[in-house]
Amino acid sequence: MDLNFSATSVSRARWSSAYASDPTVWEQLFETKWSVVSNILERKLSDPEHKVVYDELMSLLENMTNMCTLLMLEANSQPEPIIGPILDKFFTEQILERVLDWSIQLTDSLKSICQLAIIRIFEMIVSDSHSQNHCLLVHKPILNPLFRLCEWFQRADIYWRVSKSENKKTSEAEKMFVLLLNQICTKLVEDRTLLHFFFHSNQFVVFTELIPFLYSAGDTGQLARDAVLLILSVSAEDKSIAEYVTERTSFCQVLTTGLSACFSQLPRIILGDGGERLVEDEYRDFLADYHSALLFCNAIAQTAHSEVVGNIASFFYTGFLTNVIKPAFLQNDREYIGASMVYLQMCLETIVEPVLVRSIVQMILTERDDNGTLFYEIVISYVKGGDKTSVTSLSLIDSFLKLACEDVMLALVFRPLLTNHSATKKQLSVVYKASRGGELSQTYLNCIPICMLEYREAASHALLSSYMYSTRIRMDARSEQCRSWKWKYDGVVAGSFVLPAESDDDATFNVSFSRMSSSRSSTSMTPYVSNRYSNGSHLSHVFNINKVCPLGQPQEQNADLSLSELDDDLEEDKDFILPSIDMEDVSEEMTASKVMTQSTIDYMHISGLDGSESDDALPIRIEDSERSETDSEAPKSNFVLSGWRDVKDMGTFKQLLSKQEVKGEKLDSSEIVDFINQKYDSLKLGEEKKEDIEEEESENETKGKEIKSRIVTDGFSIYNFPERSKLLQTILEGVETLCENELPFNTELFSLIADLATYPQPLLAYYLFDPKEDSSEKHLLTILQGVQTRIDVMAEGIESFEIWIERGFETLKARACRIKQQSTASSPRTSDDHDPTLFYGRSTMAPPGRKPLLREPSRQETLDDQTARRTALAAILLAHLCQMLASIVLQQSLII
């Protein structure tokens, strides 16, 4: 059934340029149309039992559409916002109100048709309004019927969903209604004054009606989300609208509930090897919906009012992360766990707004399972196994590291290192030596398998240069990300409680003077100030202040300083430090007057004592007094310094004043009164401003406490951590079994190492790269040397090993091409198209797409062939890894 009526269908024969520019003809035609509509309305009004037939309905709708077309012609032709004859007719006759009253009385079979037509009429009024200064929606005869239509549509929509629950597709009326609301929101952006007409303290119909359609399929849901985003961006500074959204609507709950619903529709199994993530065609739209929902949440957090954002973050944490994501990681199905890791990684890579990222970090660091295991420890535990889930867990951990969040890195890496590593300050200082970079990088280059040295694709100066170029860019970016961290994690600045000292002479010569200058003010105060990690317990009760070098001085000068003396210093710092005065001897009165300089100047101005009008004015003479407490002259003083304590009557006061010789005229009493009043008003205004500022700070503090009350914190002390880093231990174990691992696992593992090694913290750099004296503990360098020896020995025993190397190059190239093709649609690469590095710039999550044909190893592959294939791939990867680590070590000499 075609309901696209047009005004030209009636008057096409008379349409001309003269007709289009003649308002008189418009009025005549409008009266003709209105007479038809009026008769139909009166017929039902005079006879309530009259049953409207289909032809009668079509006649009314066609004429109403033509009338609205003429109305828009009149409104757009006027240069000023005036009420023309046609618009006046709409007002006086209340045309839209009467049509709505008539429509409600129709039978159910005709009511839906009429409702759709009325929606299109209002859509015409909104979309065809091209006048910049006259929007018809500001008039109540137009606006009130629109509100009634929204309420009527809501009731009818509920009826349709109940009576036709089997039809899950969006109806045509729903699509047109959402389109109408979207166009209204667009008008609100163009003219923000319209917000006053649509929002009241107890209702915001346009916003409320959009909520049920936020997650509708297709264009309808997208239009609804765009409209909501427009409203929240326009009202971002309006606190009343923010309170309405959070307190009187279910928007925040629906937002996170819809995200959870999108997650529940995702497939429980991800195809591919873990590095290549693929889905079946039937789940392609569901994955796209999940991605759109994440983008929408992030966009809302970027544009909405802070109160709305805080509410969304709360529901995002409780309704989605802890109730949906966390249980998915605690299942017994490793396939589903691996898929859930991919979806969480997709969430991490899509959401960039800090308030939502903070919620994700909170879940990672604080949530536990029934056994008390932390969430990130659960993820690390899934690395073992070497299957597809292990690959996805490595990729997810890599996403954790990419956040460059100090809290995440403290929990995963630095907290165990601070309490369990055995390096002393003297040993750790090796990372600052200039010769370290060249010597250590050569050591890592020596770990390249001998069998790979003849292949320029895997070991060459050009490839090393490419790694050095990429490493410089990545480490500079990482250093910038870590610039705002609270600690440097260098094992020196934090004090002697972090690193055991071999002797009292352990040098701290690598700490810059500026840091040593600030160590007194920052470190000495820590016993009295709480710390966000250890709740004030990061310094033990036996903390030795002697280890702190004050202002760059040697430790011996401060060896006798005790905590009691430190308390005295702290008490002294609380006092006001008097400014230096260029006088040999200054009385107590002068000292007090110097502290209150401004008050003295004001008094001198009143008494005329600063009335000198020339630069050569003689200084005020200071005469001795009988009870003077000092006989010293003060050449730079311009006031009597003694005798004021003895002033007990007006005579003595005048006698002291008479001793002053003043050049210049004294002020009149009226001028003095004006000056005093001016000073009083200034002080009073300052107090009022101070009270306003204190009141505002109190409100902000109250809000801050409310927000903090929503956040579950789990602070910990660095002392209570007996275990070594599970992440670092897992990484070293993975490198040690390089020849037994499959290609996807090794590539994800080395990509994780690449991101971890780019952190510029000296403590981590020493642990990862430098050789250790303790041979009982495994270290990366010794492990690489062992793997190199093993690969070279195995290569000598494999027949035609060079053929397997060539096949390995082909396998890596084909895999890189597949991953690139999958990721080109969402993030096409530009400068890295010909990047020969293997572990930099890879896409971790391909966009939704069809399942391509995968080339998998033949099931008839013999055990010897499998060993040869893995050994060849391990040799290629190890050659790349050694060159990457060597380039990182060289760059560390410039960064650390």
Swiss-Prot record:
Looking up InterPro entries in the UniProt record yields: FHIP, FHIP_C
Please name the Pfam families in this protein's record: DUF5917, RAI16-like
Annotated signal sequence range: none
Q: Where is the composition biased (Basic and acidic residues)?
A: 853-865
According to the record, the residues making up region (Disordered) are: 823-865
- The organism's superkingdom is given as Eukaryota
The family this protein is said to belong to: Belongs to the FHIP family.
What the entry lists under PANTHER family is as follows: FHIP FAMILY PROTEIN CG3558, RAI16 PROTEIN-RELATED
Q: What's the protein called, per UniProt?
A: FHIP family protein C05D11.8
Recite the lineage of the species: Eukaryota, Metazoa, Ecdysozoa, Nematoda, Chromadorea
